C-alpha cells in the first residue's frame, strides 16, 4: 500500500516513470506458477529494474537496505522398520525404534546445542562477510535484548549481537521442523512405532549449490543409517543483489530522504522465490525497499504495520520514483 501511495504521488507530480505493480500470492506454497506466468507475459512486464517490498529492518534505529537472501533446501527423512505398532513390554529391547534411530541420525548431522552442522563439506562454499558488511552490522542498531523480546525467546545459542546477525543472515543452517511417529496423544501408550518421518531444511547462503547440499546430506545420512530414505524438496538458491549502481543509490537516497538516516546494507535470513524468477525472466537487477520492523510480528498471527513506517514508506517510494526518473534521458519514461 505504501508503494501504491508513493506511485500516486509520483503521478500527481507528473514524474516520468511507468510503474508496474506485481502481486505474488503463492510464496507460502513455493510459487509453483509464478515464473511461468511472468514468462508468458514478459513483454507486458518489461522493466528496467525491480523493487521488492517484502523485507524487515534490523531495528527502528536505522533503515535497512537488504542486498541478499538465504536460499532453502528442504528434506524429508523417512524410516520404516516394521508393519505395525509393537508393545514395548513384549518387543522392547529387540525391536528397532525408527523414532530413536532418526533422532540419532539427526544428532549426527547437527550439534543441537551450538547449531553447527557436522556434515563434511557443508560449509566449504560459504563466502565470509565483507569488511563493509561487518561494519554495517555493527552500526545497524541491533541489540540482543530487542531480538529476544521481539521473537519471544527465553534464551539463545549465542548472545553476542554480531554473532547473532552473522548466524541469521550470513551462515547456512540445518533445522528440524518436526518428527512424526508413534503415539502423540495425551497420557501414556507404550508402543514402538513401525515408521517415523522427520521434516528438515537447510538455509543456504550465496555461493552454495542446493544440488551439492542434497548430495552431501544424502550421502552422510545413508552412511549413518542406510535404511533412512532421504527425499529432497523445495529447492531454492540464495540470492546476492547489488549494493552499488544507480538503482541501489536511488533506494539508498530515498530511504535517507524519508527516514532521515543513511540505510545500512544487510542480508535477509529468509527466502523469496519470486526474486530469482524475476531476475531471470526480466533480465533486470532486483532491489529491496522493505519497511517492516522486527516488532511487527512478520508472518505471525498478530502481524501488524504502524503508521510511522507507512508514512515514511510513502515518502521513500515517491522519492525513489523521482530519482529513477532523473536517471533517464530528457522526456523519456523509465520502466519499473
Residues of each region from the PLM?
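Alpha-helical metal-binding/catalytic segments enriched in His/Glu/Asp
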Residues: 1-30, 75-79, 92-113, 200, ...
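Acidic/histidine-rich catalytic neighborhood of metal-dependent amide-processing enzymes
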Residues: 1-68, 329
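Acidic-enriched catalytic cores of C-N bond-cleaving enzymes acting on peptides and small amides
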Residues: 42-43, 67, 74, 88-179, ...
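Short beta-strand/turn micro-motifs at beta-sheet edges
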Residues: 63-67, 185-190
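Zn-dependent metallopeptidase/amidohydrolase metal-coordination segment
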Residues: 78-80, 85-87, 102, 170, ...
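C-terminal catalytic subdomain
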Residues: 104, 186-215
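A short beta-alpha structural unit
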Residues: 201-205, 229-244, 268-269
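Short, low-order "capping/linker" segments at domain edges
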Residues: 239-257
Amino acid at each position: 500500500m505504501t508503494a501504491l501511495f508513493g506511485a500516486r504521488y509520483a503521478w500527481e507530480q507528473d514524474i516520468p516513470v511507468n510503474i508496474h505493480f506485481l502481486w505474488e500470492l503463492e510464496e507460502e506454497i513455493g510459487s509453483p506458477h509464478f515464473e511461468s506466468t511472468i514468462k508468458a507475459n514478459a513483454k507486458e512486464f518489461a522493466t528496467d529494474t525491480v523493487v521488492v517490498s517484502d523485507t524487515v529492518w534490523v531495528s527502528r534505529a536505522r533503515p535497512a537496505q537488504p542486498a541478499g537472501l538465504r536460499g532453502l533446501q528442504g528434506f524429508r527423512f523417512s524410516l520404516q522398520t516394521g508393519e505395525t505398532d509393537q508393545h514395548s513390554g513384549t518387543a522392547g529391547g529387540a525391536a528397532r525404534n525408527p523414532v530413536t534411530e532418526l533422532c540419532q541420525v539427526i544428532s549426527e548431522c547437527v550439534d543441537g546445542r551450538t547449531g553447527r552442522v557436522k556434515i563434511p563439506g557443508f560449509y566449504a562454499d560459504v563466502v565470509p562477510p565483507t569488511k563493509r558488511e561487518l561494519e554495517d552490522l555493527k552500526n545497524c542498531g541491533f541489540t540482543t535484548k530487542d531480538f529476544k523480546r521481539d521473537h519471544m525467546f527465553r534464551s539463545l545459542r549465542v548472545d553476542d549481537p554480531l554473532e547473532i546477525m552473522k548466524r541469521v543472515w550470513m551462515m547456512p543452517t540445518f533445522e528440524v521442523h518436526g518428527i512424526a511417529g508413534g503415539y502423540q496423544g495425551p497420557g501414556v501408550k507404550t508402543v514402538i512405532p513401525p515408521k517415523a518421518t522427520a521434516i528438515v531444511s537447510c538455509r543456504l547462503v550465496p555461493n552454495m549449490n542446493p544440488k551439492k547440499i542434497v548430495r552431501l546430506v544424502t550421502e552422510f545420512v545413508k552412511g549413518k543409517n542406510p535404511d533412512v530414505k532421504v527425499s529432497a524438496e523445495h529447492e531454492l538458491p540464495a540470492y546476492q543483489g547489488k549494493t552499488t549502481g544507480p538503482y541501489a543509490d536511488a533506494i539508498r537516497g530515498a530511504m535517507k530522504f524519508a527516514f532521515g538516516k543513511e540505510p545500512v546494507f544487510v542480508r535477509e535470513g529468509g527466502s523469496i522465490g519470486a526474486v530469482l524468477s524475476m531476475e531471470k525472466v526480466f533480465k533486470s537487477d532486483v532491489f529491496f525497499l522493505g519497511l517492516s520492523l522486527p516488532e511487527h510480528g512478520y508472518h505471525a498471527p498478530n502481524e501488524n504495520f504502524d503508521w510511522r513506517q507507512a508514512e515514511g514508506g510513502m515518502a521513500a517510494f515517491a522519492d525513489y520514483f523521482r530519482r529513477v526518473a532523473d536517471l533517464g534521458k530528457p522526456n523519456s519514461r523509465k520502466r519499473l
